[in-house]
Structure formats: structure tokens, C-alpha cells
From Swiss-Prot:
Organism annotation: Homo sapiens (Human)
Record lineage: Eukaryota, Metazoa, Chordata, Craniata, Vertebrata
Protein name: Immunoglobulin kappa variable 1-9
Regions annotated as coiled coil: none
Span list, region Complementarity-determining-3: 111-117
Main location: secreted
Compartments, as annotated in UniProt: Secreted; Cell membrane
Its biological purpose: V region of the variable domain of immunoglobulin light chains that participates in the antigen recognition. Immunoglobulins, also known as antibodies, are membrane-bound or secreted glycoproteins produced by B lymphocytes. In the recognition phase of humoral immunity, the membrane-bound immunoglobulins serve as receptors which, upon binding of a specific antigen, trigger the clonal expansion and differentiation of B lymphocytes into immunoglobulins-secreting plasma cells.
Oligomeric form and interacting partners: Immunoglobulins are composed of two identical heavy chains and two identical light chains; disulfide-linked.
One GO term (biological process): adaptive immune response
Keywords annotated in UniProt: Adaptive immunity, Cell membrane, Disulfide bond, Immunity, Immunoglobulin, Immunoglobulin domain, Membrane, Secreted, Signal
PROSITE patterns listed in its UniProt record: IG_LIKE
Amino acid sequence: MDMRVPAQLLGLLLLWLPGARCDIQLTQSPSFLSASVGDRVTITCRASQGISSYLAWYQQKPGKAPKLLIYAASTLQSGVPSRFSGSGSGTEFTLTISSLQPEDFATYYCQQLNSYP
């Protein structure tokens, strides 16, 4: 039985920075995907300017608060399954789910931590 698990993803996230600096835009791709249980899934987040490793990934399920998965681009938050991993620095980052599980149905967000409004 082919069990399809859709995962809606945030397409564009704009974060405003203080002072004279330009806004940093984060663009996630793909904007939507459909995958099977057991698949390897990769989500990309691109920043409009370098943010070193100051990036976090969140998972949000309907009716629930966002859950921190990864911070500092690649550090797994305590309690998060090891099938989740993050990589990248500068302007390009990836979130990988090595073997998709039914409970991974969610919306996934990247957030830059380089500066705050």
C-alpha cells in the first residue's frame, strides 16, 4: 500500500532587520511536496545575504505551536529524532528527513537568527 504523506512548506519568509541593513529574505523550496513513507526528503532554504550558521528549522502541526528541530544550521534540538538533520552555511541551507514517517506530516519553516527586528 502506497501511503502518501504531503508536507506543506512555507514558500517565502521575510524578516526585518534594524537600522540601515537590508531585509534578509529566506526562500524555501519546494513550496509543496508529496512523498511516501520511507522516502528521503530534502528542503532548501536560501538567504538573500550571508547569515553564517544562524539558521533554525521548525516543524508545525495543525493547532500546535511550532517545534524547534534544528538550530545553528545543523544542531539537533534535544528529543528530536535523528532522522532529521540540517546542513549549510552562508546563504544555502538544507533540512533533510532521512526516512519520512507518517507523523512528519507538517509545515516546515526556516528562520534566520542573525539579527532581530
